[in-house]
Amino acid sequence: MSTRLLDAVTVHHGDCIEVLRGLPSGSVDSIVTDPPYGIRFMGQAWDGADIARRTQQGLDSSKAAPKGTRGPHGGYRSASVEAGRYSRSRRDSWAFQQWCEEWACEALRVLKPGGFMLAFGGSRTWHRLACAVEDAGFEVRDSIAWLYGSGFPKSVDVARAVNERRTHGEAVSSAAWEGWGTALKPSFEPCVVARRPLEGTVADNVLTHGVGGLNIDACRIHSAGSEGRETYVGRTKDGRWPSNVLLDEEAARSLDAEAPESGSRQGKPRSAATSGAGWGMRATGAEYSDAGGPSRFFPVFRYEAKASTDERPSVGGVSHPTVKPLALMRWLVRLVTPYGGVVLDPFAGSGTTLEAAVAEGMRAIGVEREESYLPLIQERFARGIEVPLNLFSLDSETS
């Protein structure tokens, strides 16, 4: 089932692999998504523990498939029924990776040559996602680290666990294990930056398909780029080159508190001594007349442990447990999508990426299999979204 929420937004209800198979090849400019991580979140199997129903694959010819994953007739029997929770089982990890590869293969097909895909992953399982994306045919170009300061550690108190263990009815001493735990505080989410291989050179590809590069100028780090921060003195003209580390406000404050302020002198762009030096670039950099904490070198976005009501739609008591900040998703969409382009999110959730795309002057296609989340997307767009005035005039300009 497909729903047209705006002229610029279409949402498909169904399994992402099945829906993607029905989309034309080379029909989207970018993919920005937050797929299942293959873990449990705060005790909730928010990934959808029944992934197994949609990962029946014919991998009977795969010699790499772990023992125990084959069905009674030699075919591949998905083990990703456990993908909704983190498991140390190689079989379950393999099943999650194979499922990621299956949807990534379809994502590769529907992307235009040179199109980028940004896909978030979990810190414990994103290596499986990255391998799957690469095995599907993408080039892994980079990774982005989204740092935040509001994570909650899920750790076992080792001393308490030892103290509660009893041998022959006697308590075991736990003094030696005071202060020990089993987990770190989660403070980052990785994002795989992948690109469908180019057809020819970068110049050939962008002229033919309109994609293939990153919109650097639209994502530069400006001195006044974050509200409510006192980390800058002075102002940059064009802004710094965007980095592959993104901060929330709390992470930015912590970074600035632990490091002294520094200044950047004003000057002209530096040039290589000879043409072709500096990795083929004549201009090799510029100086900035500003000063402040080290957070000024990174993009900073407002983050709340629980997204505000404006960014977290709720219908009938149902809400999505993992809503990314809208400003973050707008920055990512802007980075990899030409103005007026089509953004695809195969795991739409409550529709944050779709809203981000529209707000940035792009079209959006979303896929969501959970019926309970569809009203959240409808509610998000029913509240009204500021749409660039010339967005809907693009049809007449490009047709």
Description of each model-found segment:
Residues 1-399:
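S-adenosyl-L-methionine-dependent nucleic acid methyltransferase catalytic domains
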